[in-house]
């Protein structure tokens, strides 16, 4: 559990640093304090940090209407909640700005496929900059984009979110967008790791893929993204590969993502479809979203 909390606290440091940057103040803690903070957490608090909470929770101080979810705050240690908002072609929220009588929507950019068709990573980075600016203006900490799944099924209802059929193009353009978002002090979320390539049956599909195809096609774009950017988070996928859910797969999450690619950020579940919480945590997932109180209890019971 200690290893799972560390990436989350690093993300908190980045988001809190960003929050205070505008007024000259400094965050309450920095990376040197991580182990000290963890040592002060109770078992129940550690479990709650690994499970999201609804925006209606009384501890969440900054609500952004339409956000995808929040992490659980620990007020006694000045640990705030993290606000996560969906993408992929802009910040997906429905907020109202102070002293404005109307709802202030964010920009809807052209489809990610259209962006990829430019073959221009500078434009991808500029779009990321714009998304980061809008997230910053509304108080969003992490934007759940980009999606770089491979277009293998032309009937996939989310192909518009993805870049292309080619892992190299997808990886290079995805990395540029991530860098653009994070230039602004906002976190990006690289998704859906991996082989989430159709909507039909996506919650339970069991993808049977050869090791060569996994490495050369389905993992390659993610590898390129990780090595050319440093996304704050990576989001898992709903499906199975070879009979095992990807969000509880230590070969994918620990051996490849963590050890081979040296990824040190936060690994997040996809939203709503609850799995075996202990299996996911043991498999390498750090944060269960959007979170249910039962999941925190399951973590405590599994320790």
Regions found by a protein language model. Give the residues of each.
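Bacterial Sec-dependent N-terminal signal peptides
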Residues: 1-26
């Amino acid at each position: 559990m200690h290893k799972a909390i560390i990436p989350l606290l690093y993300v908190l440091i980045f988001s809190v640093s960003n929050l205070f940057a505008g007024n000259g103040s400094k965050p309450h803690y920095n990376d040197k304090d991580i182990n000290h903070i963890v040592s002060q957490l109770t078992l129940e608090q550690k479990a709650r940090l690994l499970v999201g909470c609804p925006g209606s929770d009384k501890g969440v101080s900054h609500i952004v209407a339409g956000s995808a979810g929040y992490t659980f705050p620990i007020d006694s240690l000045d640990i705030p909640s993290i606000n996560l908002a969906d993408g992929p072609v802009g910040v997906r929220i429905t907020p109202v700005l102070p002293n404005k009588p109307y709802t202030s929507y964010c920009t809807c950019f052209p489809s990610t496929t259209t962006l990829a068709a430019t073959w221009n990573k500078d434009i991808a980075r500029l779009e990321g900059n714009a998304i980061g600016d809008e997230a910053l203006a509304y108080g969003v900490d992490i934007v759940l984009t980009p999606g770089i799944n491979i277009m293998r099924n032309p009937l996939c209802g989310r192909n518009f979110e993805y870049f292309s059929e080619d892992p190299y193009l997808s990886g290079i353009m995805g990395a540029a967008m991530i860098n653009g978002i994070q230039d602004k002090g906002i976190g990006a979320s690289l998704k859906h790791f991996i082989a989430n390539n159709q909507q039909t049956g996506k919650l339970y599909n069991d993808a049977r893929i050869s090791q060569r195809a996994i490495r050369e096609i389905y993992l390659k774009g993610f590898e390129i993204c990780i090595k050319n950017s440093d996304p704050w988070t990576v989001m898992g996928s709903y499906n199975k590969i070879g009979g095992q859910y990807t969000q509880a797969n230590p070969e994918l999450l620990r051996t490849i993502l963590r050890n081979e690619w040296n990824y040190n950020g936060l690994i997040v579940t996809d939203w709503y479809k609850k799995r075996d919480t202990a299996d996911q945590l043991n498999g390498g997932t750090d944060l269960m979203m959007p979170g249910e109180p039962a999941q925190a209890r399951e973590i405590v019971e599994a320790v």
